[in-house]
Amino acid sequence: SSIQHCCIAGEPLNPEVFKQWEQLTGLKLYEGFGQSESSVLIANFSPWITPKPGSTGKPSPLYDIDLINSEGKPCEDGEEGEIVVRLKGHDWPTGLFTGYYLDDEMTKANLGGEWYNTKDVAWRDSNGYFWFVGRNDDVIKCSGYRIGPFEVESALTEHPSVVECAVMILAAGQHMEIYSSDNLK
């Protein structure tokens, strides 16, 4: 009764969890995205943004965030790309780490260019909301499509017979394996 706002971070939640949470508590979940190397980069910042279940929200005003494709070019709305933080052209982004401990080579490789690449894949809708797909190294290519475990899990949990599921990438990204629990309601 005293909780007024609920924020989540880490791995994204499936849309079905958002629905169930709101039905049980009457409260919306405000999702965010960040890394150990940074503070919150993208979020459903309450009360300025109406959360869209499953979306990680919009970029923090502290950061110049974009999505870049495999050719290093900015993505169009609806196109998947890697989440990047602009490093050049202004002061160092507040809350972003400044290097890897005792590893100048890795620091230069990741922080020496125009962008810091989070290695996380997302897409942006026409309203500026970002939708997390997965880690770049946690996505498989199937029939020309890039598929992340989260997308498959989200689709499966919409089915009434699935309470929970987990999708894992096996054999060096060659296939996915699915584990689920039956409807226990």
Residue ranges and their predicted role:
Residues S1-P51, D64:
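Gly/Ser/Thr-rich phosphate-binding loop
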Residues C7-A9, I68-S70, R86, L102, ...:
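Thr-Gly-centered strand-to-loop micro-motif
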Residues G10, G34, G57, D120, ...:
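Active-site glycine-centered loops adjacent to acidic/histidine catalytic or metal-binding residues
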Residues K19, G54, E105, S154:
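Active-site phosphate/pyrophosphate- and oxyanion-stabilizing loops and adjacent acidic/basic residues
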Residues S55-L62, Y116:
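Short coil-to-beta-strand transition motifs
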Residues P59-L62, K73-A109, I147:
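Conserved ATP/PPi-binding loop(s) of AMP-dependent carboxylate-activating enzymes
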Residues N69-E71, E80, G112, S126-N127, ...:
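Residue-level recognition of short loop/turn positions
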Residues M106, K119-K185:
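AMP-binding/adenylate-forming catalytic core of the ANL superfamily
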